[in-house]
């Protein structure tokens, strides 16, 4: 009878492990992990697994019979449960990144970004939350691309992964020929400095520097010297006469334009913008979008914008609709709208 019970416990634990099989090397390894947990302090354990709102929780629950009665026993149980659960999560979830391809080289003459079966989950304590659930897509050079989706859809996570701000949990992320999933942190930092520019909803200007000096920060971080000059950039953003202003002397729209200038000073191959008009009024928002369109058309810079506003998506020639962590639709627009003609509300 005891043997049957033991087999049942191992079987239940094995089933729970199989739920995250993609990051496990083999069933043998998984069962070894289970046996280690069962031998820990010679105390039997049970595994509890629950699924709620797309989240998976893995908890080790020690059996009641191994502890003293009353509050003292409860504290012993809670302490051991915490130790076991944490160790279990590390053993199971901290596996090597799984890549989909071997020795694959994307067509750089056409596709600047290519994703293959990209997944992303976040681990908080012992809670795993899947955000991206298998993304496959190819994006062309020199396109104006909008990533569109509601709050919580995974659009910002998607942007962070293709820009090198975050790493995928699984799959391949090819950007400019490099598989970002395989880059070490130091190489990822170098990649961001050399090849991409960022514009965020928060301007993050240095308050003790002028507009020009803030833009030059971006220029100094880059090794490229063949891009636009600072004067040309401020001409592009329509602020050539305001280069010596400090952030406190500028409106929100002007500060956002300076943040664009800072990104352009790196002469990036790709310009990423996360909700760049989110904190601006309609007039300033349209001006910022006009600048992004101008950069895309005149300098052939690939521009990728994240937004929740479907009207802004009309200015793009490629629109990626993301919903619940997957690409719901991929739209190509042969005649993008002018930022001044789109509805704003």
Regions found by a protein language model. Give the residues of each.
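ABC family nucleotide-binding domain
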Residues: 108, 112-322
């Amino acid at each position: 009878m005891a043997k049957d019970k033991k087999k049942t416990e191992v079987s239940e634990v094995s089933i729970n492990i199989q739920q995250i099989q993609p990051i496990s090397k083999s069933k043998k390894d998984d069962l070894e992990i289970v046996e280690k947990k069962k031998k820990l302090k010679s105390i039997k354990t049970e595994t509890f697994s629950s699924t709620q709102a797309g989240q998976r929780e893995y908890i080790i629950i020690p059996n009641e019979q191994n502890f003293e009665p009353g509050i003292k026993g409860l504290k012993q149980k809670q302490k051991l449960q915490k130790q076991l659960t944490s160790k279990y999560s590390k053993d199971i979830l901290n596996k090597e990144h799984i890549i989909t391809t071997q020795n694959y080289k994307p067509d750089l003459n056409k596709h600047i970004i290519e994703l293959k079966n990209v997944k992303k989950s976040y681990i908080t304590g012992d809670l795993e939350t899947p955000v991206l659930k298998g993304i496959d897509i190819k994006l062309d050079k020199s396109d104006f691309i909008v990533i569109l989706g509601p709050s919580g859809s995974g659009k910002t996570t998607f942007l962070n992964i293709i820009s090198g701000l975050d790493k995928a949990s699984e799959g391949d992320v090819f950007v400019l020929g490099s598989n970002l999933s395989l880059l070490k942190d130091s190489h990822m930092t170098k990649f961001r400095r050399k090849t991409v520019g960022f514009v965020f909803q928060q301007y993050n200007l240095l308050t003790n520097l002028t507009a020009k000096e803030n833009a030059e920060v971006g220029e100094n971080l880059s090794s490229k010297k063949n891009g636009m000059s600072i004067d040309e950039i401020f001409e592009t953003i329509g602020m050539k006469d305001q280069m010596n202003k400090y952030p406190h002397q500028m409106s929100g729209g002007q500060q956002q334009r300076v943040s664009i200038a800072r990104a352009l000073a790196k002469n990036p191959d790709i310009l990423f913008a996360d909700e760049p008009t989110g904190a601006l009024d309609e007039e300033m928002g349209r001006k910022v979008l006009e600048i992004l369109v101008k950069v895309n058309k005149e300098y052939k810079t690939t521009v990728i914008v994240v937004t929740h506003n479907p009207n802004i998506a009309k200015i793009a020639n490629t629109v990626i609709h993301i919903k619940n962590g997957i690409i719901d639709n991929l739209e190509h627009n042969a005649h993008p709208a002018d930022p001044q003609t789109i509805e704003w509300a």
